């Protein structure tokens, strides 16, 4: 049986997109689907709006049979705010019990991490904040002397260039020590340490070994203060669900539907934990995402939509002049991507420069001067900002690396010296921009603008 009738689909469309064309066949197929499925969407495809259409329809059916709820998970509070702004009065129904709308982190914190940690720890949770945890860690690390740290030399020595000497070598060793210790994955379930989640072998599991004692005294020091890294929250959540099997039944009885937006940003640990929380035989699980936009290092995205996934290949964000470039520079085969022929997009421009300080001023002048039709890009962006319920700015300059590692490579501060990087647990691709551009069938000389 279909999830929605024609009348319900029309109602959802008129609620969300009254002055825009009807949902196309790809989107209607997704809205009608009432089974667990993956939705594989291209940039600007309207996948979130397609999800919202299902939520509008469900809002009119509340309460659901047996008073079950809807669980909607995404990765940022901005995404939740966007959902609220677009759902309007339906949000009052959907954002209350028995439903749950929020981030994956917030869901795990509320239902798993906080209750479990508080039950097994001598101190209650004070904060789930990687930055705060790093401050406590570094204080504990600073008290360790040379002899304390010799036990991890074998783990980091290959990362120290043999050409380094003196202060440069000492600084590099210190950075690698910190990265090794604080960056390790602590399994609360096994009371063991791993280089990263998913590693086959523990780097420390014997409490009598110096390396375990060092990790326990530094990496776990924040935990003794009730301060968890974001990753720790998932570790304790995993321990709870492994030790309390009936939790899976409880969550699967509570919710009829689980919708996950931006599934491509779900890391391996989050993915595995969600698989343990929800029973696919009892909950309809639909996962929306774009595998070509994942934020993780190559090979780290566990979500892999198969050939049965619902596609949305048509983009409403850009025209064919941009789509044709994205099809060629994408790391994976993205031949199915289609631009909107009704949208006039400016051809891509690649800035080539000698002085990085010239880049942002040139970028600003381009968006202020270049026209699409009779309007500049800036004018178009300002119009879109007014239409957006959250009034977000659509013009952004995005950098590859924020932190200054003193390695001579360009990063955000090279272009904008007053920028201050915020701590992040994400891992970026290590390829260069040139490697992606080189994949284009023809060298893109018509994109290049030398400063």
What would you call each of these model-derived segments?
Residues 1-119, 249:
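P-loop NTPase Walker
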Residues 4, 8-46, 206-300, 314:
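Conserved helicase NTPase motor core
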Residues 55, 74-77, 104-105, 288-292, ...:
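A short beta-strand-to-loop transition that corresponds to the Sensor-1 phosphate-sensing loop
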Residues 68-69, 81-180:
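Conserved P-loop NTPase-based nucleic-acid remodeling module centered on helicase motor cores
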Residues 176-228:
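Conserved helicase NTPase catalytic core signature
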Residues 272-344:
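Conserved RecA-like helicase ATPase core segment
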Residues 313-424:
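Helicase P-loop NTPase motor core
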Residues 422-451:
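Long, charge-rich alpha-helical interaction segments
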